[in-house]
Amino acid sequence: MSRKFKTYYVSSTNGDDCNNGEAPETAFGSLGRINNLELNPGDRVLLERGSVFENQYLHIKGRGTGSDRIEIGAYGEGTMPCIHSNGTGIWYQDYGAPLDSPSHVYKGEVSSALLLYDVEYILVHDLIITNSSPYTTMEEYAAPHKMDRTGIAVVAKNGGTLHDITIRNVWVHDVTGNVYNKHMNNGGIYMTALTPDNEEKTGIARYDGITIENCTVWRVSRWGIAVGYTYQHQKFSGVELDEETFRKYGHENVIIRNCYVSRAGGDAITPMYSLEPLTEHNIADSCAKEMNDSVYRYPEDRMGKVAAAIWPWKCKNARFCYNEVTDTRLNQDGMAYDADSGDGTLYEYNYSRSNEGGCIMFCMEEAVHNIFRKNISYDDLGGIISPACNPDALVTENEFHMRREVPLIRESMQDGTVTLKNNKITIIKEDEK
């Protein structure tokens, strides 16, 4: 006998927690009723459009299946429902081991407006999410041990490989997370993999099937969108990365498309530890806005006052196409694109403009087999190309529209190797800047 799927309705204006929540006329009144449920395959949670859930959060429990996924979305007419968590929804994150640098924080409390913890086969769509805190001084905002915050946090831990997680048409804004913590679930949309309680029993925690599309993320700290920092990071050391390593320890079928990230405190969009991730048709604007001395004041032993816009970390054959990056703020990096410590990164058909740290960096000794082709850079600053200790890179068939005083190779990052071939360089006139 097949189970009947359930739909739960929640309304901040017309609901009541004494209701059964199974029809719009008998909607729950708060998200707390959903947090107490274990969802089953095919179940839906729908929030009424026009609802505002103040000082509330949504932490989903349960799993869908390949044929019957869970859905979190909206119903009715009007504006998308809003979740303003305001520092609620606190959970404890622990990678279970130090990260790839001893300065990186790897455990602590996190506030997440929406948390998917060991959840798979799920679609989240049509929500507005914030997670802000009041502050009156920059000392408060930049406090070194301020709690990490997320708009949407996704965690893999005790479920082995998590499949088919889709986040679509969600607005995440005003997330006042920790200025310094790069690898906690800290920012707009952030996905991680933590050490399982019993890895032999449950399997390696990883993702296969992540889609983030048509999302808007703005005024968040620290990251805009990040997919996949993992407790298995040590498996990815070295130069040429093996595909089987990703299929066992990393992530597969990662897509980030049609998203807009603006005014992130640090980096805008980053797939991590992923095999052939696709990042396309995204826009990043005015990011890395907190990577400066006026905000980044109290890092203590943490380094990391660096950020770029759209880039991969420790990926194999990552592809970036039809993206646009403008006005990334100057820091040690500050460029639009960065092929960072990965194997076979391809940037093609992208556009960059007025990024204070330049257009493209090839970062460090483990950045190999990377190609930057058929892109357009217009009025990027600081130095267009940054070959930073990388063994090789091919830059070909691009258009670089430059100010006369801006160097093609960034002076502080010229220790690597880059091959320039068939690029078009045009000097911008004063009235064209």
Tell me what each language-model feature is.
Residues 32-38, 53-63, 84-85, 273:
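Short, T/G/N/S-enriched strand-turn elements that build extracellular solenoid repeat scaffolds
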Residues 10-48, 54:
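Acidic Gly/Asp/Thr-rich repetitive segments characteristic of extracellular carbohydrate-active
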Residues 12, 28, 46, 63-141, ...:
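Right-handed parallel beta-helix/beta-spiral solenoid domain characteristic of secreted/periplasmic
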Residues 1-4, 39, 63-66, 107, ...:
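Extracellular/periplasmic catalytic domains that process cell-envelope and extracellular macromolecules
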Residues 18, 25, 90-92, 189, ...:
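Acidic, glycine- and Ser/Thr-rich low-complexity intrinsically disordered tracts
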Residues 57-60, 90-115, 138-158, 180-203, ...:
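Extracellular beta-strand/beta-solenoid scaffold signature
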Residues 69, 76-78, 120-131, 160-176, ...:
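Right-handed parallel beta-helix
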Residues 4-8, 308:
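Short structural boundary motif marking the start of a folded domain
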